[in-house]
């Protein structure tokens, strides 16, 4: 199965973890970058396109600025990123250039992908670079980013880039051999799982509670990235990037690392964008009847099923749809603002125009703009 899947892959997103790229965290691991360049050249010779999602800018800049340990403030981190980006790209340019490959830097914030026009423009730029044989190196724009427009981590960014680039495979290079059934650093009997057919609640528990910021070898965010990529119909391959030749071994059919199969029912591009790229602005709370209809029948959300609205948002915003117990059941783009929904909630669709004096449609959220989670 693995060989058949990898044989069809033409466009790959490779996410490089900071521990792999910075080694002892005293700067960039130049030996790793040289190996990556050689293995990427081999993939290119096989007719595959490669996109790199890279950490390392802050670590590289921190050393240049003489900052010991992690930056103690956001301005320090952003200053380190500003100087580190050029150092990082110089390293990629030198090592990839030895194989005749050009690299290009793309810095993104969540806003760039949440805006549909900028999202499509970024996709066109990626396609053009790949058509010219250039290897894009993507990172979050740490120099200007604030909490409101952060991706959160580069694992999440790599999953969103997989959608953006319409890639066929996400590769996550980390510093452990793959996904284990428990923390291999705490449990010497932890078992490496080579194939994950579906990411279930049990899988998430093995990685650590999904609501926690820590997990099995940093596995929580990596598992979330694999799940997001899988919902777009893309498999994820998790490999130990500290092992020389690991990409070559994987694409030669060796059973290394962990392969996560994609979801059986994948989301289309727009719904994946709604579910994972847009930042929700508020919450729409629905009754049990609406919850059942949304979850099981894939219907639109009508005002009659809404019991209250939380937060302030305009028409066209993304919101969380939650049950009366507070559990999130869906996300969607609303056809009415929070103020309008407050006036029409609990009413039939036929009453909307009489209440508001106008009508955008029968639905609070049309099913084409609604993603059940």
UniProtKB/Swiss-Prot annotation:
<keyword id="KW-0547">Nucleotide-binding</keyword>
<comment type="function">
    <text>Catalyzes the transfer of a phosphate group to glutamate to form L-glutamate 5-phosphate.</text>
</comment>
<feature type="binding site">
    <location>
        <position position="142"/>
    </location>
    <ligand>
        <name>substrate</name>
    </ligand>
</feature>
<dbReference type="GO" id="GO:0004349">
    <property type="term" value="F:glutamate 5-kinase activity"/>
</dbReference>
<dbReference type="InterPro" id="IPR002478">
    <property type="entry name" value="PUA"/>
</dbReference>
<keyword id="KW-0028">Amino-acid biosynthesis</keyword>
<keyword id="KW-0067">ATP-binding</keyword>
<feature type="binding site">
    <location>
        <begin position="216"/>
        <end position="222"/>
    </location>
    <ligand>
        <name>ATP</name>
    </ligand>
</feature>
<keyword id="KW-0641">Proline biosynthesis</keyword>
<feature type="binding site">
    <location>
        <position position="15"/>
    </location>
    <ligand>
        <name>ATP</name>
    </ligand>
</feature>
<feature type="binding site">
    <location>
        <begin position="174"/>
        <end position="175"/>
    </location>
    <ligand>
        <name>ATP</name>
    </ligand>
</feature>
<dbReference type="InterPro" id="IPR005715">
    <property type="entry name" value="Glu_5kinase/COase_Synthase"/>
</dbReference>
<dbReference type="InterPro" id="IPR036393">
    <property type="entry name" value="AceGlu_kinase-like_sf"/>
</dbReference>
<dbReference type="Pfam" id="PF00696">
    <property type="entry name" value="AA_kinase"/>
</dbReference>
<feature type="binding site">
    <location>
        <position position="55"/>
    </location>
    <ligand>
        <name>substrate</name>
    </ligand>
</feature>
<feature type="binding site">
    <location>
        <position position="154"/>
    </location>
    <ligand>
        <name>substrate</name>
    </ligand>
</feature>
<keyword id="KW-0418">Kinase</keyword>
<dbReference type="InterPro" id="IPR036974">
    <property type="entry name" value="PUA_sf"/>
</dbReference>
<dbReference type="InterPro" id="IPR011529">
    <property type="entry name" value="Glu_5kinase"/>
</dbReference>
<comment type="similarity">
    <text>Belongs to the glutamate 5-kinase family.</text>
</comment>
<keyword id="KW-0963">Cytoplasm</keyword>
<dbReference type="Pfam" id="PF01472">
    <property type="entry name" value="PUA"/>
</dbReference>
<comment type="pathway">
    <text>Amino-acid biosynthesis; L-proline biosynthesis; L-glutamate 5-semialdehyde from L-glutamate: step 1/2.</text>
</comment>
<dbReference type="GO" id="GO:0003723">
    <property type="term" value="F:RNA binding"/>
</dbReference>
<dbReference type="InterPro" id="IPR001057">
    <property type="entry name" value="Glu/AcGlu_kinase"/>
</dbReference>
<dbReference type="InterPro" id="IPR015947">
    <property type="entry name" value="PUA-like_sf"/>
</dbReference>
<dbReference type="GO" id="GO:0005829">
    <property type="term" value="C:cytosol"/>
</dbReference>
<dbReference type="GO" id="GO:0055129">
    <property type="term" value="P:L-proline biosynthetic process"/>
</dbReference>
<dbReference type="InterPro" id="IPR001048">
    <property type="entry name" value="Asp/Glu/Uridylate_kinase"/>
</dbReference>
<feature type="domain" description="PUA">
    <location>
        <begin position="281"/>
        <end position="359"/>
    </location>
</feature>
<dbReference type="InterPro" id="IPR041739">
    <property type="entry name" value="G5K_ProB"/>
</dbReference>
<dbReference type="InterPro" id="IPR019797">
    <property type="entry name" value="Glutamate_5-kinase_CS"/>
</dbReference>
<protein>
    <recommendedName>
        <fullName>Glutamate 5-kinase</fullName>
        <ecNumber>2.7.2.11</ecNumber>
    </recommendedName>
</protein>
<dbReference type="GO" id="GO:0005524">
    <property type="term" value="F:ATP binding"/>
</dbReference>
<keyword id="KW-0808">Transferase</keyword>
